[in-house]
């Protein structure tokens, strides 16, 4: 039995998208609002292939759609959790919970480390912005008088694993790096 075309604004789960690029199920949502820019997708994909490798346009568009679907899938699960808990804001912990629930357990630990470092940086930048009263400034790890940039610990130190085609996180002194 053939699947009926999606009607605008109708049916399907909250993470389902309509027809890929035909304008069918998206209602009034423009393609540029549904997808990440193709240039960004292409740049990320090129990091996973040899320098002389090429990527076909349809491959880029397919990954572009998959990324959009993945984001919707994870966000929908996190949103359901927040609704059950009567909260309106989805946070990083909700997204990690959703990823674990949906079978992406292998990504949780590296993302927890990244989220912690991100929060430390954000907290430090807020502290720095608010401490114009002359109080002692601390870095994200609580060191007095240190630079206010904790970004050094978050920089990527490597490329994607050429053989596997995806990032393989490795930990070095608490830093996140890719091999």
Curated annotation (Swiss-Prot):
This protein's GO CC annotations: CCAAT-binding factor complex
Gene3D superfamilies according to UniProt: Histone, subunit A (1.10.20.10)
SUPFAM superfamilies xrefs: Histone-fold (SSF47113)
Region described as Subunit association domain (SAD): spans on this chain: 63-74
Keywords, sorted A to Z: Activator, DNA-binding, Nucleus, Transcription, Transcription regulation
Region (Disordered): 1-32, 147-179
InterPro entries in UniProt: CBFA_NFYB_domain, Histone-fold, Transc_fact_NFYB/HAP3, Transcrpt_fac_NFYB/HAP3_CS
Assigned protein family: Belongs to the NFYB/HAP3 subunit family.
Protein name: Nuclear transcription factor Y subunit B
Gene name as annotated: NFY2
């Amino acid at each position: 039995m053939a699947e009926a075309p999606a009607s605008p604004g109708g049916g399907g789960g909250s993470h389902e998208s309509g027809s890929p690029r035909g304008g069918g199920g998206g209602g009034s949502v423009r393609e540029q609002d549904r997808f990440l820019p193709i240039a960004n997708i292409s740049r990320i994909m090129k990091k996973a292939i040899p320098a002389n490798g090429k990527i076909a346009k349809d491959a880029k568009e397919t990954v572009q759609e998959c990324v959009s679907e993945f984001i919707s899938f994870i966000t929908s699960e996190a949103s359901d959790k927040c609704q059950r808990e009567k909260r309106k804001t989805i946070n990083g912990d909700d997204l990690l919970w959703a990823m674990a629930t949906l079978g992406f357990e292998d990504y949780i630990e590296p993302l927890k480390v990244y989220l912690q470092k991100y929060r430390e940086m954000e907290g430090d930048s807020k502290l720095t912005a608010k401490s114009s009263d002359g109080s002692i400034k601390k870095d994200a790890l609580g060191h007095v008088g240190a630079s206010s940039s904790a970004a050094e610990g978050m920089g990527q130190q490597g490329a994607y694993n050429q053989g596997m085609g995806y990032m393989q996180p490795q930990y070095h002194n608490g830093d996140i790096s890719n091999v």
